[in-house]
């Protein structure tokens, strides 16, 4: 990943500004949520076969001083690109931006993305569009995120901001200097578990993976902790037996980790663990009960509708039969009267 690269931050002008308006020149740190990357990859998979790259808008949050940006959301923007020109649906971009900001008032426009690592004149045009005043990110710099989607290769991501350093007035609209800035893929424990579950499907032929239950997840987590403890124990034993080279940094890390362990009696730990297991079982039982009730309710509703329709048909049949019987009785009575008169 590109977040391991080294960067040199420069104070940069972002373009001509009116009197009293000062652009932000502080260094940037960009954090990217996994769901934004997944949306970009999904957009790339659904692109037309003759389209080399796709672009879209990045939404997220920005710190008060503008030095920290977190990319949380994104959406695709239609565009056509040839060797001579590029056309972006600006009306669609403005309408979608207004809808997203209405649905998520805490998010703001932070930049745009492209599924290609190439930076060309068209990239500068789009960058200037997102950095402009009014509908752009001014006075903050627009972040340009590139995500490589070459089949068979690792996914590489890079983030840039722009500055018109050395750009003449005639080329100011379609030229800019892209400056790389550090970034990281930020995810929590819940998202990490989801990513591990998704990545486990890559080794299967059907590319699918069943979702584990709470008990299975707990068992897997406990087994993972036991494996790590066994690994640490083997390392310490090898160091004591002079079979492995000691590391002062690793020893200090282990001491700090042990110092964070709470001083709790093993019996209390076992009791709390059993209580947690009982809570998990109760939640699982209640979830299954609710699922069963919903299924039973749907079946009863379907059965009631079916029985109601059958009763209605039966009632109509009885009514028709009664009418036919009455008509037959009247005809028989008429024949008897004519016979008597004769």
Curated annotation (Swiss-Prot):
Stretch list, region Disordered: 310-342
GO CC entries: eukaryotic 43S preinitiation complex; eukaryotic 48S preinitiation complex; eukaryotic translation initiation factor 3 complex, eIF3e; eukaryotic translation initiation factor 3 complex, eIF3m
Biological process (GO), any one: formation of cytoplasmic translation initiation complex
Location in the cell: Cytoplasm
UniProt domain MPN: residue ranges: 30-166
Feature: compositional bias, Basic and acidic residues: 317-331
Subunit-structure text: Component of the eukaryotic translation initiation factor 3 (eIF-3) complex.
Protein function: Component of the eukaryotic translation initiation factor 3 (eIF-3) complex, which is involved in protein synthesis of a specialized repertoire of mRNAs and, together with other initiation factors, stimulates binding of mRNA and methionyl-tRNAi to the 40S ribosome. The eIF-3 complex specifically targets and initiates translation of a subset of mRNAs involved in cell proliferation.
Name of the protein in question: Eukaryotic translation initiation factor 3 subunit F
Species in which this protein is naturally found: Phaeosphaeria nodorum (strain SN15 / ATCC MYA-4574 / FGSC 10173)
């Amino acid at each position: 990943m590109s977040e391991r690269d080294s960067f040199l931050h420069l104070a940069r002008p972002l373009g001509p500004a009116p009197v009293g308006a000062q652009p932000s020149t502080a260094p940037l740190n960009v954090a990217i949520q996994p769901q934004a990357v997944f949306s970009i990859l999904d957009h790339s998979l659904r692109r037309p076969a003759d389209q080399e790259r796709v672009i879209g808008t990045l939404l997220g949050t920005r710190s008060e001083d503008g030095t920290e940006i977190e990319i949380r959301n994104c959406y695709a923007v239609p565009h056509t690109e040839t060797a001579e020109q590029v056309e972006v649906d600006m009306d669609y971009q403005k309408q979608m931006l207004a809808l997203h900001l209405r649905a998520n008032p805490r998010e703001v426009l932070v930049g745009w993305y492209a599924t290609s690592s190439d930076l060309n004149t068209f990239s500068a045009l789009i960058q200037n569009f997102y950095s402009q005043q009014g509908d752009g990110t001014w006075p903050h710099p627009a972040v340009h995120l590139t995500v490589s989607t070459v089949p068979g290769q690792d996914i590489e991501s890079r983030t840039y901001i722009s500055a018109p350093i050395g750009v003449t007035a005639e080329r100011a609209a379609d030229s800019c200097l892209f400056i790389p800035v550090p970034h990281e893929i930020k995810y929590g424990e819940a998202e990490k578990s989801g990513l591990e579950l998704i990545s486990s499907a890559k080794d299967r032929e059907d590319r699918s993976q069943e979702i584990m239950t709470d008990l299975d997840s707990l068992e897997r987590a406990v087994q993972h902790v036991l494996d790590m403890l066994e690994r640490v124990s083997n390392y310490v034993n090898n160091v004591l037996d002079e079979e492995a080279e000691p590391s002062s940094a690793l020893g200090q890390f282990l001491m700090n980790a042990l110092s964070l362990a709470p001083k709790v009696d093993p019996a209390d730990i076992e009791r709390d663990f059993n209580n947690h297991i009982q809570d998990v079982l109760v939640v699982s039982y209640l979830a299954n009960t609710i699922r069963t009730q919903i299924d039973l309710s749907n079946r009863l509703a379907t059965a009631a509708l079916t029985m109601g329709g059958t009763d209605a048909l039966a009632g109509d049949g009885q009514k028709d039969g009664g009418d036919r019987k009455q008509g037959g009785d009247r005809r028989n009575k008429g024949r008897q009267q004519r016979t008597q008169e004769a």
